[in-house]
């Protein structure tokens, strides 16, 4: 693995992280809604991160199957109608992980008046297979801390795509079902071999796992066919989960890590100074090189040797990124 240095924005305190992340999210939203999407299918879709030449054909079989079923139900439209509909229905597609990231978004986004919630399609980077009422549920936490608090009459209602709660006792079936949801959400776009999120938001745990991709689960980290995988016997927290895979994360237009707290400092040091260790986030830093940003407070950057940048807020929307 070569050394790839992402952008690292440093902050003195949690409040600064929350405000900057919110600004970053809004900029990504505005870029997506104003500019549309730039396809990277030729960059990522035909070539596996791990060299599996069969990935493209097998993935396309799954995608085409779902698209065929959807088309048979929905009839057909001429090209001009499709183009007009696409422009009118342009959406901001975002993936969220759970944990402390939800609190960061709660603090930063809910006080903003420029969030176009009604144009958001929200997916989850991973999910713990527990009831939504559980404090361990990523969707449940996001619902209580964010979704239930949105003034939908003023800002609109986001479309939220979560797992089927009735499938939490079967990790494989739950993962397969959520993958079908992703395929339906992205298969009509230019890039269909892999979904391309406008923004993929992640945290990073003290043990180095991101989403539900754990450092010592090498088979999961090498997965390059499935979009969503089951994760069983997780070493911390709920043992059964599902997770989006490394290729899906790396295919996003922007990938952003949000990390705070002194307990994260050792793992951040390893990620930034020893990428050859192959932690999941180091793989993402490499696989999505040039599109990765880290928002980290000073506590998590203690004794970390890395170039730190000061985040500049977008006073005026500049869509040159």
Curated annotation (Swiss-Prot):
It comes from the Eukaryota. One of its GO terms (molecular function) is 6-phosphogluconolactonase activity. CDD domains: 6PGL (cd01400). Residues 75-85 have a biased composition (Basic and acidic residues). Keywords: Cytoplasm, Nucleus, Phosphoprotein. GO terms for biological process: carbohydrate metabolic process; pentose-phosphate shunt, oxidative branch; tRNA export from nucleus. The modification Phosphoserine is found at residues 65, 68. The modification Phosphothreonine is found at residue 320. Residues 63-74 have a biased composition (Low complexity). Residues 39-57 have a biased composition (Polar residues). One of its GO terms (cellular component) is nucleus. It is found in: Cytoplasm; Nucleus. Pfam families: Glucosamine_iso (PF01182). Residues 36-85 are annotated as: Disordered. Belongs to the glucosamine/galactosamine-6-phosphate isomerase family. 6-phosphogluconolactonase subfamily. Present with 1970 molecules/cell in log phase SD medium. May be involved in regulation of tRNA subcellular distribution. This is 6-phosphogluconolactonase-like protein 1. It comes from Saccharomyces cerevisiae (strain ATCC 204508 / S288c) (Baker's yeast).
